[in-house]
């Protein structure tokens, strides 16, 4: 190699702080370790300082080259990261839209649940009203049963038999009395006929004596008038007796008919008893059904309360999860800020490395001319190295914090995954239990509906029986009306008999007229007539006694007739009461039938509503199950991806920790090498400052120091200069190669850090804020205002 010879002026001109390269000698020693060695002097006691200085130069040059290479790689990585960030933002927006749709569905489900709850409350109110009406109807049934028992007590079989026996005995007595009286009357009539025959004979004999008896006719006529009155009274009594006998016969017929009616009424009462027993059984069945319905309602209320509690717990857990996500997002934002700070620190380090590289270049260009400047720059570099060391320590701390946070986030993700799985299992169990409860309730409801149908059929049969009894009562009333008509006919016949008696009275008057004609003939037989009058007086006495006895008997018969009429009136009243009770029972049965029809209609409507609600709930449950399965699959995929990413991150972190430890060791070695040199430079700087502050003598001292420095560092000849320059170039090339290696390593490290940061962002769902998209987030806009009962927001 040949090097051009520099002019002597350059080496001898004392320009600046340091002498020219040719103005000093270079002496090699065996104890030196670096490529450049210096002779010991009073200020420079250690030989390691030059070597440490050169090592620092190598590091600065390597860092500058590594930063240049890293800039080109970081641009590509930033482009890739921007693409990944955009893709992640799109995915996050899609997920937010899906979440908004799910929230809307949940709100719709809540509104439908509120509607169903309102319907159920209305059904419960209707049921309470029906239960109240049922209670009132049961009270009516109890009152009817009491009235029926009273009627049974009144019309018991023993009482009827006793009354019938008493009436039959009285009728037998009356019959015997009537027969004895008829016999006595027949005997008297025969005696009268015999007497009349005798009188006719006497009349034929006394025709001649009529003239004699005309004078006595006045008295006889008076007596005859009295006798006529008495005979009229007797005829009236006889007619009354005949009427009484006719009435007795009619009463017998009426009694027989009443006995038949009583038997029929007993049968009807038995049928009514059976129907009442059936009604009691039906009421018991209805009570059992109401109890079952109440149990079903309580079960349904319990299920609804459990569903509400579970929904509240789920909503609370969702709120807790959202709060946790918000906290994690805040932590992630803090981590992002820390990363931004670390990136800013790295950029500052890059700038510092660039400055150091520029300073190294200037130092290499002005190596020989500005050694003092080089020392000052070395001081600055050492200070910056301290700052860099501190920043590296901070970056290590940040990396450790990031590792801990990634571990904590991974643990939280595993916990969330476990919680989600447990909640899914609980939801599936809850859905299965809810479906089973719905099926059980449906079966119970079908059973109750079937029992209601049976009850309605039984009530219809009871209604038919009531209709039959009402028809029989109508027939009885018709019979009673026919009997009333017969009674009216008998009264009419009695009026006809009285008319006949009046005609007979007229005939009797005619006979009296004939008797007046015969009075003339009767005068002749006055004596005989006196005898006959005596006999007639006896007969009249007998007739009076008979009249008194017959009057007593007639009074007794009248009393018996009154008692019978009272009994008939009582029976008619009881029949009317029974008819009224039957009418009330018919009205109650009609009301029951109407209520049963209303219940059937309502039950059919409620069955349809329950079927619709169950079908809609089953569809919604299936949709929710499908959505949960899809979400589970998505979460599992995301967790698998996160696990892979965490594994990759752990590998990268292990590599980074290895590299950090390596660089730490290198830095410690450099720091140990630069410590003594730093102390000497500090002492030199202090001396320089003290000398610069002095006037006059300071310049001379500086010149002396410059000369001594030139003597120490000056070359004795050209060969030594060439060797020194060759050594410097070799050291420079070595430093450049080391700087390139360090830059490549730093680029790799930054790439790994960026990749890890992107994976962390993907795992935590955090994206960097784009200022161009400020106030334009469609997913975060509340298009619909929040309701009062919807505290959850997207």
Curated annotation (Swiss-Prot):
Any one GO BP annotation for this protein: hyaluronan catabolic process
Comp. bias regions, Basic and acidic residues: 74-87
First and last residues of every Sequence repeat: 442-462, 463-483, 484-504, 505-525, 526-546
Phosphoserine sites (modified residues): 20
Hyaluronic acid-binding: annotated span: 719-729, 741-750
Tissue expression profile of the protein: Ubiquitously expressed.
Annotated region (Disordered), positions in chain: 1-87
Residue positions, PTM Phosphothreonine: 784
Record: glycosylation sites: 134, 279, 446, 467, 488, 509, 530, 561, 601
Region feature (Required for interaction with FAM83D): 365-630
Alphabetically ordered keywords of this record: Cytoplasm, Cytoskeleton, Glycoprotein, Hyaluronic acid, Phosphoprotein, Repeat
GO MF annotations, alphabetized: cargo receptor activity; hyaluronic acid binding
Main localization (coarse): other
Region (5 X 21 AA tandem repeats): 442-546
GO cellular component labels: cell surface; centrosome; cytosol; spindle
Task of the protein: Receptor for hyaluronic acid (HA). Involved in cell motility. When hyaluronan binds to HMMR, the phosphorylation of a number of proteins, including the PTK2/FAK1 occurs. May also be involved in cellular transformation and metastasis formation, and in regulating extracellular-regulated kinase (ERK) activity. May act as a regulator of adipogenesis.
Subunit relationships: Interacts with ANKRD26. Interacts with DYNLL1. Interacts with FAM83D/CHICA.
Protein name, as recorded: Hyaluronan mediated motility receptor
Organism of provenance: Mus musculus (Mouse)
Organism phylogeny: Eukaryota, Metazoa, Chordata, Craniata, Vertebrata
